[in-house]
Amino acid sequence: MEPTIKRIDDSYSVSAQLALSDLQALAALGFRSVVCNRPDHEGGPEQPEQGAMQQAAQALGLKFAYLPVQTTGATPEQAQQLRALLSELPRPVLAYCRTGNRSSTLYEVATQGTRTVRPFDVVVVGGGSAGISVTASLLKRDPSLRIAVIEPSTEHYYQPAWTLVAGGAYDVNDTVRPTREVMPKGAEWIKASLSAFAPQRKVVLLSDGSELGYQQLIVCPGLQLAWEKIEGLEDALGKHGVTSNYRHDLAPYTWELVRSLRGGKALFTQPGMPIKCAGAPQKALYLSCDHWRKQGVLEAISVEFNLAGAALFGVPTFVPPLMKYVEAYKAQLAFQSNLVKVDGPNKTAWFDVTGADGQVTRVEKRFDMLHVVPPQQAPDVIRRSELADSAGWFEVDPATLQHPRYPEIFAAGDVCGTSNAKTAAAVRKQVVVVADNLVALRKGAVLPKRYDGYGSCPLTVEKGKVILAEFGYGGKLLPTFPMNPTVPRKSAWFLKATLLPWFYWQGMLKGREWLTDCKPD
């Protein structure tokens, strides 16, 4: 397995602790020099000593340098030493320490002043739902703001509709638009990736080696789908009956599989939380089963839902009405059953099942159709940053969405280390909290808004009916409409399939703030 590498710029990348066996992969990737920033013996006997690493590197034709940095941080002398090394070592260079953080910080300090910093009032990291929406909301409040939006992708997706695509109820082409069309007028689109934060200097470093300065920073890059954590999955996706509604190009394949399956075994999976739209894994099951029932083939299909957790849904109020559909579709629930391996050609999946005694057993299951929801985590650049919490998500106050140590930094969307559901509905309310609080901060005023943890999950229990689950922190019900939220309704389907997509493109992304009031306790 190749080491996980974070590219800082064209000539310099960083990595967590390397093994001796990683050096051959680095040479194959084109690196010409390796710098070790981790002191010998810091990680105990399992950490390769720099002498052994140097010998192995030189045998592969790689230059090697040892510049140990303590966990307390780099000194000015060490920054000067790195500058000297960089003038001598052939590039590109790969530096490593325990996590990569010290190597990133040392490089940032060593190259400080050598690059021009472009100044902005506000820098927004990410051009997804949260990034575009909060930028539009800020410009509505103050059109004079100089805002940069960092987003490498040229396409912008409306992801909540992919479930409908997989159920034959939506055109996949209607879920994507060019990023240039949704970028708010007045904002500058920076087509690059974020490489590192330098919060002490109020600067972010980009993949092209440039730097952007900010007075305020909003971090909303979304989350990262960790397909690689399930052995064999990446090679199997899109063929052999293996699919996922978490990818734009695979949602149509799900519908193809559903239409063609007339009998056999259909497995649906849900990884450990948190994930984006926690109801999406079971939505795939419900819409598939509804189609099979209407086609008269459900009795010939064995349906099983494998959940890594111990509950069907995180808010207990909605479990009874959902269980009625599980029973009606004759789906079997397998709790504490986590997908760990897939063999597509042989249509076999393996699950780690945790028993009541805590013992884990590896269970093999055959399938004709396998719908996979991948494990999910914060992006690498967040997890390796000092701005992350202990779980790797972006650290914010759950009410103000402000970073606890850097008050000029806010966050919104899936990247936040908050306990709310990671949904577009949550973003709709978060961006107003962030926009109002950021503007107040710029004026030296008290932050006026508090986020209540609102999130919404329109559970598509059958084609044409939805249970509209709306809730906040602690599972508190926060219904928008004065109706029993546990009842499946046609009106909620119309909201999900017609009104919300229209509002997303014409409302949220344009700074129109409808139904955004929060009700914190």
Question: Which ranges hold each PLM region?
Answer:
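Cys-dependent protein tyrosine phosphatase-like superfamily
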Residues: M1-V93, T105-V117
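Short, well-ordered coil/turn residues at beta-beta hairpins
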Residues: C36-N37, S207, C220-P221, V373-P374, ...
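Beta1-alpha1 glycine-rich phosphate/pyrophosphate-binding loop at the start
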Residues: R118-E188, G272-P316
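A conserved FAD-binding loop/helix module that cradles the flavin
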Residues: A412-V461
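FAD-binding core/adjacent interface of flavoenzyme oxidoreductases
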Residues: I190-G296, D357-V360, H371
